[in-house]
UniProtKB/Swiss-Prot annotation:
The protein, known as: Large ribosomal subunit protein bL12
GO (cellular component) term, any one: cytosolic large ribosomal subunit
Gene responsible for this protein: rplL
Oligomer and partners: Homodimer. Part of the ribosomal stalk of the 50S ribosomal subunit. Forms a multimeric L10(L12)X complex, where L10 forms an elongated spine to which 2 to 4 L12 dimers bind in a sequential fashion. Binds GTP-bound translation factors.
Ribonucleoprotein as UniProt keyword: yes
Highest taxon of the lineage: Bacteria
Molecular function, one GO term: mRNA binding
UniProt family annotation: Belongs to the bacterial ribosomal protein bL12 family.
One GO BP annotation of this record: translation
Length: 137
């Protein structure tokens, strides 16, 4: 198997936090003049001085978290479209007339928070069809 020195290095690598592993990768890139990017073609890339089949000290890539909860913002309410937008806001939020009126008049304001992507798009579309300017954050 591997020498004691290699085994110790492997154990040390396993104990690294994600931040430390990212720092290690950056340091290796700077010292050895290599990039830790995956090749575009999906083929195997061999670094100079590294034998194929030798264990590599590569840090795990940080997964990109996809946003799952969105907020629909009411950005602008044209005065001539206020009543139509008010009706849509009441339908979306379930608020009473006074609360919905306060919401519409307070634009820019969050209309609905913590909704999934499809619902957010539907709400935005309804508001825009009524004449409002809306956005998803």
């Amino acid at each position: 198997m591997a020498s004691e020195r290699v085994e110790k290095i492997l154990e040390d690598l396993k104990a690294l936090s994600l931040l430390e592993a990212a720092e290690l990768v950056k340091g290796i890139e700077e010292v050895f003049g290599v990039k830790a990017e995956a090749p575009a073609g999906g083929g195997m890339m061999v670094m100079p001085g590294v034998m194929p089949g030798a264990p590599a000290a590569a840090a795990p890539a940080e997964p990109v978290e996809e946003q799952t909860e969105f907020t629909v913002m009411l950005e602008e309410v044209p005065a001539d479209k206020k009543i139509a937008i008010l009706k849509v806001a009441r339908e979306i939020t379930g608020l009473g007339l006074k609360e919905a009126k306060d919401l519409v008049e307070a634009a820019p304001k969050a209309v609905k928070e913590g909704v999934n992507k499809d619902d957010a798009a539907t709400i935005k579309k309804k508001l825009e069809e009524a004449g409002a300017k809306a956005s998803i954050k």
